[in-house]
């Protein structure tokens, strides 16, 4: 494992990959390379506290792919910084909608492109209203 980390440290010194964190994962390196080749896009996810999470997904990603990418991003961030150990994602998705330009992303199988989401577009969380 040490050999892998040493090799990864050398790869991260490349100018295209220099903005990746020190404890980079292979998935993050692959995502950055896909971004450089135009095979992926960055979706800026705005939390209610104002924090913006740059999440990388493939160009043909669905809403479900975006949700899974958000989960991976938050999990990696928590591992690096500490903090809350467990988040109930089923509760998060049951309580909040993702929205883009005022439109709720309700269908998990629908492509982000069909909602008009492109590279560097913003998506935010909005609380679901209870239905009676």
From Swiss-Prot:
First-listed, main subcellular location of the protein, grouped into a coarse class: nucleus
Compartment annotation: Nucleus
Sorted UniProt keywords: mRNA processing, mRNA splicing, Nucleus, Spliceosome
Protein name listed in UniProt: U11/U12 small nuclear ribonucleoprotein 25 kDa protein
A cellular component annotation (GO) from this entry: nucleus
Coiled coil: none
Organism: Homo sapiens
Keyword Transmembrane helix: no
Subunit details: Component of the U11/U12 snRNPs that are part of the U12-type spliceosome.
Domain of life of the organism encoding this protein: Eukaryota
Organismal lineage: Eukaryota, Metazoa, Chordata, Craniata, Vertebrata
A GO biological-process term: RNA splicing
Domain Ubiquitin-like residue range list: 41-132
């Amino acid at each position: 494992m040490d050999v892998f980390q040493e090799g990864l440290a050398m790869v991260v010194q490349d100018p295209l990959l220099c903005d990746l964190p020190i404890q980079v994962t292979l998935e993050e390196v692959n995502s950055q390379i896909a971004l450089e080749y135009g095979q992926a896009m960055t979706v800026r996810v705005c939390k209610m506290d104002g924090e913006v999470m740059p999440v990388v997904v493939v160009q043909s990603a669905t809403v479900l792919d975006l949700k899974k990418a958000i989960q991976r991003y938050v999990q990696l961030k928590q591992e690096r910084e500490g903090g809350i150990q467990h988040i109930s994602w089923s509760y998060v998705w049951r309580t909040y909608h993702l929205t883009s330009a005022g439109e709720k992303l309700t269908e998990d199988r629908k492509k982000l492109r069909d909602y008009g989401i492109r590279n560097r577009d913003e998506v935010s969380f909005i609380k679901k209203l209870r239905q009676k």
